[in-house]
């Protein structure tokens, strides 16, 4: 049995990952914000016979994070998955930027994954586990596109932060992987997306399972394709 900690687990890809892990009898600590719609996650936990435990966590709130860290202090974590994210403000072009919204997007999508990785690193080390962060091809530096710029910047930032984390944790034997879940039919991805959350989660689960220190620091799509930065 593995133990997984998944952020942003109340819907979409996060919820699909919770179902995938719990479905094979792995223990899942599933986090969601207090204000989020988490009825489906709570119902799933209630019928999971203890395989799923819901933890209240706003990933950008240090007080919430400290509380979650205390709750999980004695729990080895085999897989830490940074999934929580936001799409950014309504105005996010270079010439019409909601700067407060930009800061909030960076806080959730880029800074929080690193903060969470540091907070739960002792748990991951105790299990000889691994750290996974979901990102996006929209953060690729080779793209000149400027739509959804706050979101793009946040994903470029988290890619670099996770590569840095991978470099620093490699001597300690903790692998770090950046995953692109594909274009998924979620609230963020829209109804026209190609993949269901379950298809994306199943593909990523295979990659997570076989991740070792030799593959640390890579940026992979859900189907295993290596992506450019």
How should these model regions be labeled?
Residues 171, 178-181, 190-229:
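C-terminal helical subdomain
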Residues 55-67:
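The beta1-alpha1 cofactor-binding region of Rossmann-like NAD(H)/NADP(H)-dependent oxidoreductases
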Residues 32, 175-181, 185:
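Conserved SDR Rossmann-fold cofactor-binding beta-strand/turn motif
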Residues 64-67, 112-119:
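Conserved mid-core alpha-helix of short-chain dehydrogenase/reductase
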Residues 7, 77-85, 109, 133, ...:
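Rossmann-fold scaffold of SDR-type NAD(P)-dependent oxidoreductases
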Residues 22-40:
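Conserved glycine-rich Rossmann-like NAD(P)H-binding loop of the short-chain dehydrogenase/reductase
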Residues 10, 14-19:
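N-terminal Rossmann NAD(P)H-binding glycine-rich loop of SDR-like oxidoreductase domains
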Residues 86-106, 111-115, 125-170:
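Catalytic loop of short-chain dehydrogenase/reductase
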